[in-house]
């Protein structure tokens, strides 16, 4: 005989309490990155809230606290400020940015951060988005609903879609949680690990109103490069893998170039749509992921 398990109200309360605890701890690594224009007085809290995005504390290099976030706040910005989980605000600078994907590392001098703030913040733990499955619990933090400091609970609706970007493809995570059109933030699992970076700008029309983000595993190499002040390599192609079926037709194994970005290094090198890339920097290229 099959046994039907029911979730009583007490069990639900315990589950909700546990999820809130995970969210509260993970929120210590989430900040608000604020772009200040000359006309705005940040000391009077009068800046435009639309000129801010969520950021994630990802490293401490000994001198600076490093924060990963979108570059959209940099337009017409004269100063950058970081608001930490305890509500304190400190000035920041851009350490390195990737214009192609639209993310940057922002740096805050450790010497400017008070001891009381250190007790309320933490460095994020990055998980693996590759292990995320459809139906898994999802917690969203940051500014997914258009205002900072939010938290939402739901499930992963899709974990197998990808976004074709410059020089590679990026895994996407889509949830069943409603989102603001310009939502930013993070997706965490029940272990408190960050598995996704929310960017509603990449949502398709059908999922525009649902929290969507990059799987963190596809961003780790970029985060490491930017954190070290290094540029993310950019060639400027969008391509597809040459599958076994295509290879059987006499086309060499590699990456098929679908499009070439205007004024890109690829265009300058003479690469054209329809070309097959089989080697780069002396190494054989067998797939788009290997090329990336």
Where are the model-predicted features located?
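Catalytic-histidine neighborhood of serine endopeptidases
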Residues: 60-104, 109-111
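Active-site substrate-binding loop(s) of clan PA
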Residues: 93, 113-147, 177-179, 213-217, ...
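Active-site region of chymotrypsin-like
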Residues: 111-123, 152-210, 247, 251-259
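PDZ/PDZ-like groove recognition
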Residues: 47, 178-181, 227-291
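C-terminal cap/linker of serine protease catalytic domains
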Residues: 18, 22, 190, 194-250
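Active-site-proximal beta-strands of protease catalytic cores
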Residues: 30-34, 65-70, 131-144, 175-176, ...
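N-terminal targeting leaders that route proteins to membranes or the secretory/organellar pathways
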Residues: 1-52, 79-81, 103, 112-117, ...
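A conserved glycine-rich beta-strand in the N-terminal activation segment of trypsin-fold
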Residues: 12-21, 37-70, 89-91, 123-125, ...
């Amino acid at each position: 005989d099959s046994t039907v398990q029911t979730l009583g109200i007490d069990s639900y309360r315990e589950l909700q309490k546990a999820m809130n605890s995970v969210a509260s701890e993970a929120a210590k690594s989430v900040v608000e990155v604020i772009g200040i224009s000359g006309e705005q007085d940040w000391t009077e809290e009068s800046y435009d809230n639309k000129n801010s995005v969520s950021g994630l504390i990802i490293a401490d290099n000994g001198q600076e606290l490093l924060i990963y976030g979108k570059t959209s706040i940099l337009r017409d910005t004269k100063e950058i400020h970081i608001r930490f989980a305890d509500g304190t605000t400190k000035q920041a600078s851009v350490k390195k940015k990737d214009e192609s994907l639209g993310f940057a590392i922002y740096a805050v001098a450790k010497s400017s951060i008070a001891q009381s703030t250190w007790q309320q913040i933490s460095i994020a733990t990055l998980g693996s988005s590759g292990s995320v499955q459809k139906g898994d619990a999802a917690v969203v933090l940051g500014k997914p609903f258009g205002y900072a400091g939010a938290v939402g609970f739901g499930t992963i609706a899709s974990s197998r879609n990808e976004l074709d970007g410059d020089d590679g493809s990026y895994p996407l995570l889509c949830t069943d949680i409603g989102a603001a059109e310009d939502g930013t933030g993070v997706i965490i699992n029940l272990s408190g690990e960050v598995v996704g970076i929310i960017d509603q700008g990449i949502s398709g029309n059908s999922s525009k109103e649902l929290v969507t983000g990059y799987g963190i595993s596809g961003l780790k190499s970029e985060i490491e490069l930017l954190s070290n002040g290094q540029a993310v390599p950019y060639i400027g192609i969008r391509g597809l893998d040459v599958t076994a079926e295509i290879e059987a037709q006499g086309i060499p194994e590699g990456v098929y170039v679908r499009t070439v970005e205007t004024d890109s290094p690829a265009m300058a090198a003479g690469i054209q749509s329809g070309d097959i890339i089989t080697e780069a920097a002396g190494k054989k290229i067998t797939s788009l992921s290997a090329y990336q």
